[in-house]
């Protein structure tokens, strides 16, 4: 072996590279930790480049308002302009908006009719349509004709009166129902026993037919399931 022979030189070099990498990693961690602490500390703020202030007389809130106003676009809609004052600023006062004014409801009621006008219109629509200048003879003939009309009545009026009489409803409810159906001069229900029995039999027959038809339809729907004819799955 020579004079300058060294044993284990490869091991020493390997340990040196490992220690250097570890030291660099630790230094990187320290720098990262220091940077994080500096950003959190209120006393050590990062220096920022100064910005040129074009409007030194405006404060920060005024700049924000101007920036927001530049972003908006007014397309000529009146409902947007109503919320602004003459100088262009938004209405923030309590009484500036239309729906917060004291006379807002009164302005809305301008086109509404008064109670007297509504009563006059109802009277003209539902009241007696006789002419005021008619003679007494014409009045007597009108009353006679009006008294004869309920006795005869139209086809629908007779049908309703017989149906109501067959159900056994009292006269006040029958008159109210006839008025709701649009029959102004409803004829009085007849007390003929034969007509009442015929009407009752007709109603019973109609109810029985409806029950039979419902049973047939239900059975058809139940038995037709799965056939593909629209009765279900």
From Swiss-Prot:
Biased composition (Basic and acidic residues): 36-115, 189-206
Bias-annotated ranges (Low complexity): 135-148
Pfam families to which the protein is assigned, alphabetical: SMAP (PF15477)
InterPro entries for the chain: SMAP_dom
Domain of life according to the entry: Eukaryota
Stretches the record annotates as Disordered: 1-159, 181-206
PANTHER family referenced in this protein's UniProt entry, alphabetically: ARGININE_SERINE-RICH COILED-COIL PROTEIN 2
Name of this protein: Uncharacterized protein ZC262.2
UniProt organism field: Caenorhabditis elegans
